[in-house]
Amino acid sequence: MRYNLSNICDYVKGKIDVAVLDEDKYISTENMMSNKGGITRAASLPTVIQTQAFLPGDVLVSNIRPYFKKIWFAEFDGGCSNDVLVFRARDGINKRFLYYVLADDAFFEYSMATSKGTKMPRGDKAVIMKYEVPDFTYEEQEKIAGVLEALDKKIQLNAEINNNLAA
């Protein structure tokens, strides 16, 4: 059986004062890395008073040009640009499992196919929540997320080793 994304998560709507943020705690589309590469330090903070808030365990996805596949599993609390979608897993949904559902290339392809605009396509927030996801028990979600997280850690370790060899 399959569900819509809206059955397993919600968009976060909370705000945070920019005054309590620094460049390490602010995420925008500019400091999200392409191809699921995580984040870097922001170059600057926005000039607005408040921005969208996120918490550890939330999943942040750039909503501009989805083909860049910019996604990050939040490891700390902070604030982000309005061009970044913040997803929060509902009760009974494993947070890492949600991350891997959204990190799947099929999600980015769906987001592009249903996006609006040509030069700077944006995902349609209402349609994104209709993305179909498989129905797994919490225990199955934990197992799937555990295997994928172990693979991600191995890939990251191999990349660090390669960088050290190149240096």
Which stretches of residues belong to each language-model region?
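A short beta-sheet element
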Residues: 50-52, 56-108, 112
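A short glycine-rich beta-alpha junction/loop motif
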Residues: 79-83, 116-145
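Non-catalytic DNA-recognition/assembly elements of restriction-modification systems
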Residues: 1-16, 32, 130, 134, ...
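Active-site donor-binding loop signature of nucleotide-sugar glycosyltransferases
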Residues: 29, 89, 133
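Sequence-specific dsDNA recognition surfaces
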Residues: 4-56
